[in-house]
C-alpha cells in the first residue's frame, strides 16, 4: 500500500484531496505546515493559522487519518520572506506563491514527507500530472486543471521532474463546485470555508505595511508622462538582427523626471509595481493614473492616464539564462532555436500566443499582441496546449 502525505492547509481543496486519496486506497497522513510566527515582522493583524490548523485537525479526525503539524517558519523566513524583501528593494515584484511551491511545499515539506516513509506528496492544487515515455525514460507532464477559473498550474511553473515524480494532485480533474459538493457530502468542516487569498499559507497580507517594517519609507515624486510623448514614437532602425530587435522591444524605456509633470509625492518607489492604480493618492485627474514604471535609484514613480496608456504595453520580455526553467527538460531550446507557445505573465491571465527565441545569454518571449504591465520579477510560464512546459523570471 502506497503512503501519501497530504499538505492539509485547513481549506476545502486539501481536505477533499485527502479524502479522494483515501478512497483510492492510499495510506494517507495529514501534515499541516506552520509557516509563520515571527513577531518582529507582523504580516497581518489576523492570525489565521491557529484556526486553519484546527480545521486541518478536525478534517483528519473525521477521515480517521494520522495528523501532525510541522513548523517550517525558519525555512519560510529564509527562503520566501527574505527573498520578497530583496526583490522589492531592487524594484522588482516577486511572486511568493510560485516560490513557496518550489522551495517549501515541494522541497522542505517533501523531504519531511519522504522521511516519514511517504511515496508521494499530495496538495489541493487545481492542476494535473500525467506521464509519457521519451527515449525510454519516464517524463512527467504538468497539465492545467480542468476548472478553467481555478487552474493553478501557473503557481507550479518552477517544479522539476524530480519534484513532479513524487507529486499527486487529486482534485485536478474536478471543478471547485464539485470539490465543495464532496466536502459537504462527507460533512467536512471546511466545506463552506471561503478560499484563502494571497501569500501562500500566511493569510491576508497588506503589502506596503508589511514592507515598511523592513524597507524604510523615503519620499519621492510621482511624475505623469503624456501618452503622446516622443519616447513612444521612436523610428524602427533598419538592418537590425532579430536579437537586436527583440532587445529593443523588451527594454525598459528610459524615463526622466523632466519628461513629465509632477503629480504628487509617494513614500518609496519600491512599494509600487507596474500596472498598479491604487495607493497613488493623486487627485484631480479625469481618468485614473496607472504606474507605468518605477525607478528605485532616483526614487521616482512614472504614471500614465488610463489603462491603455502606451507606457503600459510591450510585446516582448527577456529571461536571463540562469532564470530559464524547463519543467520538460527534454524540450529545452538550444541557442538559435525557437518555439511557438501559449504564455501567461500572471496567474489567471488568459493564455496568449507567443514565440520563444533562445539566444546565447537568455531567452526572449515575443507575444503576438502587446501585453499590459509586464513586470520585472514576476514569472512568465509557457504552455503547449494544456501542458505547462517551462517558465522564467521576467528580467
Curated annotation (Swiss-Prot):
Keyword Cytoplasm tagged: yes
Keyword set includes Transferase: yes
Interaction with target base in tRNA: region residues: 95-97
Site, Interaction with tRNA: residue positions: 125, 378
Positions with a binding annotation for ATP: 7-14, 33, 124
Reactions listed under catalytic activity: S-sulfanyl-L-cysteinyl-[protein] + uridine(34) in tRNA + AH2 + ATP = 2-thiouridine(34) in tRNA + L-cysteinyl-[protein] + A + AMP + diphosphate + H(+)
Disulfide bonds: 100-200
Interaction with tRNA: region residues: 150-152, 346-347
EC class (word): transferase
Active site per the UniProt annotation: 100, 200
CDD domains (UniProt xref): MnmA_TRMU-like (cd01998)
NCBIfam families: PRK00143.1, trmU
Protein name: tRNA-specific 2-thiouridylase MnmA
Amino acid at each position: 500500500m502506497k503512503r501519501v502525505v497530504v499538505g492539509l492547509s485547513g481549506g476545502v481543496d486539501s481536505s477533499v484531496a485527502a479524502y479522494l486519496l483515501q478512497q483510492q486506497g492510499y495510506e494517507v497522513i495529514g501534515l499541516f505546515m506552520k509557516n509563520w510566527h515571527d513577531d518582529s515582522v507582523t504580516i497581518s493583524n489576523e492570525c489565521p493559522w491557529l484556526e486553519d490548523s484546527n480545521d486541518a485537525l478536525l478534517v483528519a479526525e473525521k477521515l480517521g487519518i494520522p495528523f501532525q503539524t510541522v513548523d517550517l517558519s525558519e525555512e519560510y523566513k529564509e527562503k520566501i520572506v527574505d527573498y520578497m524583501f530583496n526583490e522589492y528593494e531592487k524594484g522588482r515584484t516577486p511572486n511568493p506563491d510560485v516560490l513557496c511551491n518550489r522551495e517549501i511545499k515541494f522541497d522542505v515539506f517533501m523531504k519531511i514527507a519522504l522521511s516519514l516513509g511517504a511515496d508521494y506528496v499530495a496538495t489541493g492544487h487545481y492542476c494535473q500530472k500525467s506521464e509519457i515515455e521519451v527515449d525510454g525514460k519516464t517524463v512527467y507532464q504538468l497539465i492545467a486543471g480542468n476548472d478553467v477559473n481555478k487552474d493553478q498550474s501557473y503557481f507550479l511553473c518552477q517544479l522539476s521532474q524530480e519534484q513532479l515524480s513524487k507529486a499527486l494532485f487529486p482534485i485536478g480533474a474536478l471543478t471547485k463546485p464539485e470539490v465543495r459538493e464532496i466536502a459537504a457530502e462527507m460533512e467536512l468542516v471546511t466545506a463552506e470555508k471561503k478560499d484563502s487569498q494571497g501569500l501562500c499559507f500566511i493569510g491576508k497580507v497588506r503589502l506596503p505595511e508589511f514592507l515598511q517594517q523592513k524597507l524604510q519609507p523615503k519620499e519621492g515624486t510621482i511624475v505623469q508622462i503624456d501618452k503622446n510623448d516622443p519616447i513612444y514614437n521612436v523610428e524602427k532602425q533598419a538592418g537590425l538582427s532579430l536579437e537586436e530587435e527583440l532587445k529593443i522591444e523588451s527594454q525598459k524605456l528610459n524615463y526622466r523626471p523632466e519628461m513629465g509633470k509632477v503629480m504628487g509625492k509617494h513614500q518609496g518607489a519600491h512599494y509600487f509595481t507596474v500596472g498598479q492604480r491604487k495607493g497613488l493618492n493623486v487627485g484631480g485627474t479625469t481618468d485614473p493614473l496607472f504606474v507605468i514604471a518605477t525607478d528605485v535609484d532616483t526614487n521616482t514613480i512614472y504614471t500614465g492616464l488610463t489603462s491603455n496608456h502606451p507606457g503600459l504595453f510591450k510585446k516582448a520580455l527577456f529571461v536571463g539564462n540562469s532564470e530559464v526553467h524547463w519543467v520538460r527538460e527534454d524540450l529545452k531550446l538550444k541557442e538559435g532555436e525557437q518555439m511557438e507557445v501559449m504564455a501567461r505573465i500572471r496567474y489567471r491571465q488568459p493564455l496568449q500566443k507567443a514565440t520563444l527565441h533562445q539566444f546565447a545569454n537568455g531567452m526572449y518571449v515575443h507575444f503576438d499582441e502587446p501585453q499590459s504591465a509586464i513586470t520585472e520579477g514576476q514569472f512568465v510560464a509557457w504552455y503547449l496546449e494544456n501542458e505547462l512546459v517551462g517558465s522564467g523570471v521576467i528580467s
